[in-house]
Amino acid sequence: MKEAKIENIDFGNALSERYLAYALSTIMSRSLPDVRDGLKPVHRRLLYAMLQLRLEPNSGYKKCARVVGDVIGKYHPHGDVAVYDTLVRLAQHFSLRYPLIDGQGNFGSIDGDNAAAMRYTESRMTEICTLLMVDIEKDTVDFRPTYDDSDLEPVIMPASFPNLLANGSEGIAVGMATNIPPHNLHELCDALVHLIDHPKAEISDMMNFIKGPDFPTGGIIIDKAELINAAYSTGRGSFRMRSRWEKEELSYGTYQIVVTEIPYQVQKSKLIEQIAILLKDKKIPLVSNIRDESTDIIRLVIEPRDRGCDPQIVMESLFKLTNLESRIQLNMNVIGSNNVPRVMNILEVLQEFLAHRQNIVTRRSTYLLNKIKHRLEILEGLRIAYLNLDEIIKIIREEDEPKAIMMERFKLTEIQVEAILNTRLRSLRKLEEQEIINEHSNLQKQQAILEEILNNPKELWKIVKKEIKAVQTKFGLNTVIGARRTSFEEVTLTNQVVDITAFITKEPITIICSKMGWVRSLKGHNTDLSTIKYKEGDAEKFIIEAYTTDKILIVSSEGRFFTLLADNISKGKGTGESIKLLVDIGNNDITNILVHKSDQLLLLASSIGKGFLVNSNEVMAQTKTGKQIMNVPDGHTCIACLPVNGDSIACIGESRKLLVFNIDEIPEMKKGQGVTLQKFKNAKLLDIKIFNKEDGLSWNNNGKVKLEKNIIAFLGKRGSTGKLPPMGFHKNNRFSS
């Protein structure tokens, strides 16, 4: 038995080499498209398998299971689910601007519904798909062995139209990603023709033709032209996109808003669900209802709460809170013709495509020229055979080795003799000299044209230009599939803040929050609290007088702020609803609840003895998850959030030391841990109080208010330890019992 050889290598080097190999495989063979045909390997193999199955646009459909089986069996040794998902996407009219596959059956929907199983669906290629593989049989591209060396597959497709930009691409590799939106083919062809006529054209020239993305789902791009051009100049950027909507007048002066197009890759069902949740949470008070009346076309009906609402303001509030407005990324990271992945700008992508087409036309012309030369050689031999027909037939009949004799006797080449010998005697007898002469003459004319194309770059570029214009004619703006779907509009209302409180009647309310976190609101102020009932084991914790138009700040023990509209708090005399249904407070306690007042200073303090001042406008949260303002270490909590309505602060902790200092010693911050308020050793800060020094320090002791005017003994600098509190101070070391 042969002894095993064990080689010691560095683990780090081995790991890096293998990870690099994996990364390269992911980038080159899976995730990034080729700039020339806009396809990834799985797309290329799928379409080539359909070509081999002769699934032309005018042929019958075949089961998708048959197609997928051929792909994974011959070319792509991966899971059938991944291949079928690819096939489905190439057939979805809402995913691809120019679908490459014509599907029959259930291929999913814009609601996010899955396609039917591959055994039920059928497919064939679309007309534009055939343009990707036109002339592939004419030696226009290289082929390589398949994974098991049993067949050949194309390295690249001839691609007679710029599929990368026309249909876009998405992919996530290792350390890099690509995100290219679809574009209008007519505009791309215009840009390519201009680039052929003006090889030194710049990016700005291209942008005169390419206005921006053109999505299969339509929509409106609301960015300025300068921002769009800047994105294409670098190959990186993003586009803001909005749904298309219109106002429908109804009877009695009412109206409804109808959304007819939604942003690309937004699932309609999830969009409706998103709006419904906002309605339930009372986050969009301008809207009363939404319903889906879509058929083959999208029709989302939004009903305003009041007919006096400006529909533009209603939609602005929805754009701000929902995916009716979304951002589309641009990252043109592709594999170049040199097999190196990099980010290209729009000009470089177009130049790479034209270079590819130049190479395709050159290789096709060379192939056709060689075929013509081969045929001309054969025709010369057939003409000689016609002139010496009887003698040639005699040689064929009588000689055992007629090939050598014919080559020597008539000065024929081996190719010519093979052609004569492979022709039936009956066909030889039917040869007519005029037919041979005519075919020979026609082929010589074609030969001259092809030689001119190969020898004269101008003629070659004329052919490239002619073929691009042919594509433009077939799929241009005047066709159903070619008409631009996405429009452009510079929106000035995007940054407008919609004040939803303007649509709420201002009424006094009293907000009640219990110790167990149940919150409710009662009409009016000065409410009789004795009539309020709580759940068993629960009791009051916060009582706040506010108005329905107020915004309420909720501070959690982890230092996170939440914002609620007072009108959204449960109304009535029941036990209310859990605060956890309104905000994502988790298992944290509520430190305080207070009414938001613009530009008011708030003092935050934690049990570790630190704190800072923060402007109330900085703590406003826009989402249910809140906004982290005070960073609290593990094992500690945010113990206080108080409005600053005095000039001094008093601190007391577990050490039973009282410290008083000027509020001006505390800095104003936007977020963080803050500065040390009181110094402790193995103790925590328990309570703070803000007061005016000249009024004295007061505290509550078993229902009695006590006042200490002489506080000189407790004055100190911020960060000091303090001194024992005055006689009669409550034993719980807090300013309220």
Swiss-Prot record:
Protein's cellular compartments: Cell membrane
Reaction equations catalysed: ATP-dependent breakage, passage and rejoining of double-stranded DNA
Pfam families, alphabetized: DNA_gyraseA_C, DNA_topoisoIV
Active site: Y120
GO BP annotations listed: chromosome segregation; DNA topological change
Function: Topoisomerase IV is essential for chromosome segregation. It relaxes supercoiled DNA. Performs the decatenation events required during the replication of a circular DNA molecule.
Entry-linked NCBIfam families: parC_Gneg, PRK05561.1
Subunit record text: Heterotetramer composed of ParC and ParE.
Record-given protein name: DNA topoisomerase 4 subunit A
Organism: Rickettsia felis (strain ATCC VR-1525 / URRWXCal2) (Rickettsia azadi)
